[in-house]
C-alpha cells in the first residue's frame, strides 16, 4: 500500500495516530489504544525524502528529531514527528481532520464564542498531549474567520490546520521555517498589526512574558499549555518565573487572562471519542485569587460559577451522559 492508501484506510477506521518504525511492524492508535496495523511498514526514509526539504533533512540529521506537517491528496493533512532510534528512523503521524471543525461540533462550552469577542486578553487551551487542543484552537480561528473582521497571525510548530481567509486575514508562520522561535516570532508580531495572535505553545518564560504583554496591549492571544486543569495552568504560568518575578506576573495574569479551557477525550458509546471540558472564566473574584496566589481555591470557584458559564469536568461528563454519548 502507498501512503495515500494507508491514510485513507486509517481515516476509515477512525485512527488518530500512525507509528511507522524502520525495524518493526506498523501500529496505529484507535480510540486511545495502540493496535497492530493491517499493512506493511512503508520505507520511512523514502517517505522523508519525499516529504522534507533539504533544510528539514539537515535539521533531522543534526538534531536526531524533527516536527513537521505534510498535505496529501484529498485535503488530508498529517502532523509528523520524525526521530532517530537505535534501529533507524521512526515516524509518529497524527491525522488531522480534513476540514476545520466548528465549536458546536466539538461540544465546546456555549459561552466560548462570547469570550472570543474580547478585543484583548489571553485565552488558554490546556490538556494532555493528544487531548485535541490544536483542534479546539482551529475551531476558535474558524469561528473568528466567519464572525469577525480581524487580522489573525499564527505561530505554530509545525503549521497544522490550513486556513483560507474569509472575513479575517489569516497569516500562518511556522517555527524554524518563517521565524526561529515562538519568542522571536511573537516579538515581531507586535509590529505586524495583528488583532488576534495564535501561539501553538507557551514553551518558556520569555514566550509567556511576551504573550502577557501582547494580551495587555490590545491583542487577543490564543495559546496552548500542557496541563490537566485550569488551576494547574495558572500555577504553571506563574511557576515558569523566578521567585522575585512571581508577584508581578500574578498581577499581570490577573488583569490579562480571559479564560482557561481545559479538555480531555473519552471513548464514547459509538466507539468514537468525545471531548470533556473544564472552563475557568476570569471574573473579579478569580482575578483576586490569582493576584493573591490562592490558586488552590479556583476549582471551587469553577464548581460554583455555572451562572457565568464556567463548567467542571464532572458537569461536562454529566452533560455528555444526558446527550447519550457516555
Swiss-Prot record:
It comes from the Bacteria. The keyword NAD does not apply. This is Uncharacterized protein YggR. Belongs to the GSP E family. Keywords: ATP-binding, Nucleotide-binding, Transport. ATP binds at residues 127-134. InterPro entries: AAA+_ATPase (IPR003593), P-loop_NTPase (IPR027417), PilT/PilU (IPR006321), T2SS/T4SS_dom (IPR001482), T4SS_GSP_E_ATPase (IPR050921). One of its GO terms (cellular component) is cytosol. SUPFAM superfamilies: P-loop containing nucleoside triphosphate hydrolases. It comes from Escherichia coli (strain K12). PANTHER family: TWITCHING MOTILITY PROTEIN PILT, TYPE IV PILUS RETRACTATION ATPASE PILT. CDD domains: PilT.
